[in-house]
Amino acid sequence: MNKKLAAASLAVLALAGGSFSVQAADTPVYSLDAIVVTANRTPEKQLDSNASVSVVTAQEIEQKHFTDVAQAVKNVPGVFINTHGAGSQSYNSDQIYINGSSNVVVLVDGMRRNTNGNSLMNASIGELVNMDSIDHIEVLKGSASTLYGSDAQGGVINIITKKAKENGVRTTLRTSFGDNDKEKYTLYNEGKEGQVFWTVEAGKELQGDYKDGWGRKVINHLNAEHYNVKLGYDLGNDSNVVLNYEKYKSDYTMPDKGSFDTTPDAGKKDNDSLSLQYQAKLSERLTNQFSIYRNKTSFDIPNQFWAMKMKTTGISDQLTYTMNKQTLIGGFDWYKDELPYNKGDISEGTSVRNIAFYLQDKIDITNQWNITPGVRVDHHSQFGTHTSPSLSVGYKQNEKTNYYFNYKTFFVAPNLYQLYSYFGDKTLNPQEGNTIEFGINHEFTDTLNGTFNIFHTHAKNIIRSNPTTWMYENTGKANVNGFSLNLNKEISQHWSASIGYSFLHMNAEGDSNINSDGNLPESTLNINVGYQADRFNANLSGRGIMNRYGSVNNPEMRNYANYWVWDLAANYQFTKGATLFARLNNIFDQFYTDVGTSTSPNADYWYSAPGRNFEVGLQFQF
């Protein structure tokens, strides 16, 4: 039945074309003419990028009222996030998967935000809540080892923040309330005076206990606040220097062993990030970007092995040289991950360092054909030197169609938790492998565009936790196959829509289920319908999960392998600069969990998502 449903969905996508696909006149149907930077670390049209790139715009963030980055990217085809309960602000979760891999690099303005030492996530994107400061989010699906690190096996999430470009000052005030004792207050200010530009954001969020789709109460408490200050100076000639500081702090309470444990665990989080970035146009052909950053992550969960503080310090520099038919990119990345404090079983002061040099050369062989060889050389303080070559071939049939073929290799070192924790193994080997992908970016008409991407990943020395002993081990080889398809259509002046489908198949190991022992779904369908009229706009979003079977050891998860979750957001500008907005989440009160490793609804370690809940608020801009 589910296979027939998936096949029918694909048939609709392939044959019906635009008639099934929608988003509104001013709702963010993202054109393939839009400029993206993540695919090749230099600005280019999305159509020409030789990669599968999805974009979440600032307009989409504002109209749908996403709370954090995790919520914003969850509906991107090919992305799956293991969200525990109400979200990672009151847990230590939000493991990100792209194309079936949890080895994903997260960047803010091109600077790493990954954490090293956490068992449940590689970056705390659910705690990146400064949404007003975001210009757009680029999600690169597929290995991006050459430019972003050999651990970018699944892909890259690059959060691009705003820079005020026009003189003047603009301010946004927002407040909202909802059920489950939800309250939110935010202030955002941006401006430019002469050569100085800035953005300032501050916010506070409160949450209480919630009910799942079966009406059962789940312990949940959150008292969080965040601050963000960016100060920049325009040096002229497309050059600038930017200083940025972010702070996130919270007190929270979660249930001890899953949603229906009545024992509350109280914890704290305290994160901050400081960075300095210099961008310079040295000549008509040569540009330079230099970055230095320091990230701190601190979380304290009673009775958990991963209660610790983590610190990352990094420096990167990149030169881009553009010729008539050639773009040469080269640079280096250095970072150090360390545990300055840990109350668990990993020794305080434990650290690892990695330095890498990379070079990539995009050559236009003809007006239609291009080839991009690349190489990255990493030297890891514990695992030595590894070389990761890559090759991309592009064929631009015309101004509306681009085909590409990519071959990328990767090397993923074990993290500190996998090496040194109670469940770790110091003899683990790095995970290595390659990804082959083929894709098409195509504009059917001025109002309809689509992308298609198919990939195969082969990896060896897979690092996984043993389901019986929980000890980390190298478990052999993995072969991953999948594809994703996305269509965007502007139907009329008022109506628009989008639809995306992704398929994933990972071979089963031993007696386990497919797709990482059932942790990830075989099929995901994402639908968005938008309406825009003068002062009113609304968006209906649906996410369908199919065939996420769960572990062989937890057969009851099969009863919850398929589900749909629908959300609705609406905005009404009742006077100039003033908007009333509302959001209804999980409209049909679906009972589900985003955690594929859950057991059963009445047992420990089941993590129910919230049932139907709402938020209503006011926004003022001046």
Spans of model-derived segments:
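Extracytoplasmic beta-strand/coil segments of soluble accessory domains associated
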Residues: 70, 74-112
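Periplasmic-side early beta-strands and strand-to-turn transitions of outer-membrane beta-barrels
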Residues: 146, 158, 165-168, 174, ...
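Surface-exposed extracellular loop regions of Gram-negative outer-membrane beta-barrel proteins
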Residues: 249-251, 256, 338, 345-346, ...
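Outer-membrane beta-barrel signature, preferentially recognizing the C-terminal barrel domain
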Residues: 259-281, 308, 400-402, 407-460, ...
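Face-selective signature of the C-terminal outer-membrane beta-barrel domain
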Residues: 234-249, 266-398, 444, 448-454, ...
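Gram-negative outer-membrane beta-barrel transporters
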Residues: 364-371, 456-458, 474-553, 573-579, ...
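N-terminal periplasmic accessory domains that precede
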Residues: 69-72, 94-97, 107, 124-127, ...
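Short acidic/polar hinge/loop motifs at secondary-structure boundaries
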Residues: 95, 112-141
